[in-house]
């Protein structure tokens, strides 16, 4: 056994810490060579032990035990540390044998080689694991490596998830990423749709929204549904958006109404919660109005008139027919039978600011106000009906005559407001009136500006009447003393529906679910939401009402841009839209004046005919003939001069309208 105390006593310099030499910082291979030479010079002074003689197997077992112990102590191989390690170890032989008398002592060279082998084994083991022995990692480096590994794992997981999602959705499918995001969002919703068993709440102003399913054209284009209705009064619009870096995301906008009908709701369900509560009102001597409002092609005519199959319509499944059936059911009840009520119906349309009777070969009607400030529709025929079947026949007759045309969004769009009225009369006097209005499809002015003049005039008149309708509903909801019903022919005709304490109104906003109609859908919902938030149930503050009053125009009704916080290009477009609307108003006024002057000229026709007949008599008075001719010419000259001036002004207004339309088309914002 080696006694290191004796070794230290003989060589005290071994216990001294040697300063590091600059060469110790050399690379590992060169450093090992230098240290090996130093150890040889130092270890050569160690004497051999005198107690016992060890064989080669004993030396090998000692070296192996030293190697294992060095690994357990992290093998920090520094020269002073190695010396301390050698000092602490006392390794007994594995197989002790008696000392051999033939050998007196072990040469010092053998001991030196043995120690050298032990140190070299420790050096070798430390060089085999240089990370732990030479450079130990700090905590910061370890944390950075952990974060890097987690990041790589997260990237791999995301890549795997994207691959799985891509397999679920066809990558060639347009907007498939938006479809996936909408599907994931809907998975988090708890849906409780409206059912026939839900209670009906009565409102003076009831605003509902109805979503139609995707039609054949939208399915052929592989459009996605961006509308969700999770509950009976809540609607969500998943508006697709793009960030600056072209990252796609959804902006989910929520709207709350009295009732919200999804694509599975039938006309019967819609009627039960919208128009049916209003039938009782007209039997109580009131006025009721039900509007269907929305983008062209969103399902207004289907809701009001019934199922459509091409141009044919099943009127028995529309709100018109359902309301008439309930009217006759209530009329036959004992409490109302004694009143002796008679049921009359009228059906007319308002097209481009003019009224036409759909039940009288589209005869043109005139709207006048009598001395009692009551609006009268001159020439409108009222038809007596005795059953719901008679009403359906009238509806079929009038619907076949209604004006329609091709627009940006619908090839067979209703371009007029159709008003079907159910009148209750008791002994010739008006007892109650129910007006069911299928409004024309609203479109933005920027979309109709590139069409022909007739389409532009249609769109301008439609938007003007819708804006006036909103103002009248606002006055009704706030119980204002003044109702601005003179702003359009539509509100003039429905004036008595907006005044009086016993007046009730219901609006059904119909929307399209396709992604291409998202902007139009938002415009419709904002219009309907404005009507609802102005009702007494929501109770806006006075500051909000003042802000609503000062707004110049609703984006959802006419599509014009609201001044303020706009770019220079948008301000120019807004100014041009204002000029376009002014030109349209001027054209409409001049047109009416020209028609009046022409009628005056035609009325002078009998005078000329009388003069012609006078000349056929053999003894007519020439003096009388000349006097009458001069008088007729003077009258005709006055009317012709007035007509000529009106026609010139009309031509100028048409040129201004054409110029404004071209400017709008050239600067129209990209969609």
Curated annotation (Swiss-Prot):
Role description: In complex with KIF18B, constitutes the major microtubule plus-end depolymerizing activity in mitotic cells. Regulates the turnover of microtubules at the kinetochore and functions in chromosome segregation during mitosis. Plays a role in chromosome congression and is required for the lateral to end-on conversion of the chromosome-microtubule attachment.
Taxon lineage: Eukaryota, Metazoa, Chordata, Craniata, Vertebrata
Gene Ontology terms, MF aspect: ATP binding; microtubule motor activity; microtubule plus-end binding
Region described as Negative regulator of microtubule-binding: spans on this chain: 153-184
Segments forming domain Kinesin motor: 204-534
Entry keywords, A to Z: ATP-binding, Cell cycle, Cell division, Centromere, Chromosome, Chromosome partition, Coiled coil, Cytoplasm, Cytoskeleton, Disulfide bond, Kinetochore, Microtubule, Mitosis, Nucleotide-binding, Nucleus, Phosphoprotein, Ubl conjugation
Assembly notes: Interacts with CENPH. Interacts with MTUS2/TIP150; the interaction is direct. Interacts with MAPRE1; the interaction is direct, regulated by phosphorylation and is probably required for targeting to growing microtubule plus ends. Interacts with KIF18B at microtubule tips; this interaction increases the affinity of both partners for microtubule plus ends and is required for robust microtubule depolymerization. Phosphorylation by AURKA or AURKB strongly reduces KIF18B-binding.
SMART domains from the UniProt entry: KISc
Coiled-coil blocks: 564-604
UniProt binding sites for ATP: 294-301
Gene3D superfamilies documented for this protein: Kinesin motor domain
Region (Disordered): 36-62
Disulfides per UniProt: 191-233, 290-506
Name the record gives this protein: Kinesin-like protein KIF2C
Compartments reported by the entry: Cytoplasm, Cytoskeleton; Nucleus; Chromosome, Centromere; Chromosome, Centromere, Kinetochore
Positions of region (Globular): 1-200
Motif range (Microtubule tip localization signal): 44-47
CDD domains: KISc_KIF2_like
């Amino acid at each position: 056994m080696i006694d290191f105390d004796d070794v230290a006593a003989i060589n005290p310099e071994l216990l001294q810490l040697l300063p590091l030499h600059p060469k110790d910082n050399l690379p590992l291979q060169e450093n090992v060579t230098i240290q090996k030479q130093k150890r040889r010079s130092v270890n050569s002074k160690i004497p051999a032990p005198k107690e016992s003689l060890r064989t080669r197997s004993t030396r090998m077992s000692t070296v192996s035990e030293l190697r294992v112990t060095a690994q357990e102590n992290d093998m920090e191989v520094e020269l002073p540390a190695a010396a301390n390690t050698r000092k602490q170890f006392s390794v007994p032989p594995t197989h002790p044998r008696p000392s051999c008398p033939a050998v007196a002592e072990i040469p010092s060279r053998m001991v030196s080689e043995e120690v050298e082998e032990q140190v070299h084994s420790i050096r070798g083991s430390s060089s085999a694991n240089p990370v732990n022995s030479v450079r130990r990692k700090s905590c910061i480096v370890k944390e950075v490596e952990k974060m890097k590994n987690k990041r790589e794992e997260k990237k791999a997981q995301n890549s795997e998830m994207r691959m799985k999602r891509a397999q679920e959705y066809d990558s060639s499918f347009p907007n498939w990423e938006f479809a996936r995001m909408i599907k994931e969002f809907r998975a988090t919703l708890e849906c409780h749709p409206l059912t026939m068993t839900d209670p009906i709440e009565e409102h003076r102003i009831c605003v509902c929204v109805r979503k139609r399913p995707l039609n054949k054209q939208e399915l052929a284009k592989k459009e996605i549904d961006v509308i969700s209705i999770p509950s009976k009064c809540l609607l969500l619009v998943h508006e697709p958006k793009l960030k600056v870096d072209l990252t796609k995301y959804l902006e989910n906008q929520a709207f709350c109404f009295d009732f919200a009908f999804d694509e599975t709701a039938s006309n019967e369900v819609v009627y039960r919660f919208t128009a049916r509560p209003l039938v009782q009102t007209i039997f109580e001597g009131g006025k009721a109005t039900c509007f269907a409002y929305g983008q062209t092609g969103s399902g207004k005519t289907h809701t009001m008139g019934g199922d459509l199959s091409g141009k044919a319509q099943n009127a028995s499944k529309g709100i018109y027919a359902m309301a008439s059936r309930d009217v006759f059911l209530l009329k036959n009840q004992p409490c109302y039978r004694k009143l002796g009520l008679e049921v009359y119906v009228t059906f007319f349309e308002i097209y481009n600011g003019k009224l036409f009777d759909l039940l009288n070969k589209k005869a043109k009607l005139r709207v006048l106000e009598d001395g009692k400030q009551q609006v009268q529709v001159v020439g409108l025929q009222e038809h007596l009906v005795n059953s719901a079947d008679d009403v359906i026949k009238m509806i079929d007759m009038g619907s076949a005559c209604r004006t329609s045309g091709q627009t940006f969004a619908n090839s067979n769009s209703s371009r007029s407001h159709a008003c079907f009225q159910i009148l209750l009369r008791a002994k010739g006097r008006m007892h109650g009136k129910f007006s069911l209005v299928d409004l024309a499809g609203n479109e933005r002015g920027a979309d109709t500006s590139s069409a022909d003049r007739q389409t532009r005039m249609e769109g301008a008149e439609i938007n003007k009447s819708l804006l006036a309708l909103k103002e009248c509903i606002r006055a009704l909801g706030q119980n204002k003393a003044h109702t601005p019903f003179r702003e359009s022919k539509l509100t003039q005709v429905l004036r008595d529906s907006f005044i009086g304490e016993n007046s009730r109104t219901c609006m059904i906003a119909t929307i399209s679910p396709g992604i291409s109609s998202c902007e139009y859908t938002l415009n419709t919902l904002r219009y309907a939401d404005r009507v609802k938030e102005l009702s007494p149930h929501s109770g806006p503050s006075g500051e909000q009402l003042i802000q609503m009053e000062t707004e110049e125009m609703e984006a959802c009704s006419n599509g014009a841009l609201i001044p303020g916080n706009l770019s220079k290009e948008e301000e120019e477009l807004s100014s041009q839209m204002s000029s376009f609307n002014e030109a349209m108003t001027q054209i409409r006024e001049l047109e009416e004046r020209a028609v009046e002057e022409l009628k005056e000229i035609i009325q002078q026709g009998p005078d000329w005919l009388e003069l012609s007949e006078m000349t056929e008599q053999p003894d007519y008075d020439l003096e009388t003939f000349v006097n009458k001719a001069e008088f007729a010419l003077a009258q005709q000259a006055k009317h012709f001069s007035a007509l000529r001036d009106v026609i010139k002004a009309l031509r100028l207004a048409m040129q201004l309208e054409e110029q404004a339309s071209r400017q709008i088309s050239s600067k129209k914002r990209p969609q």
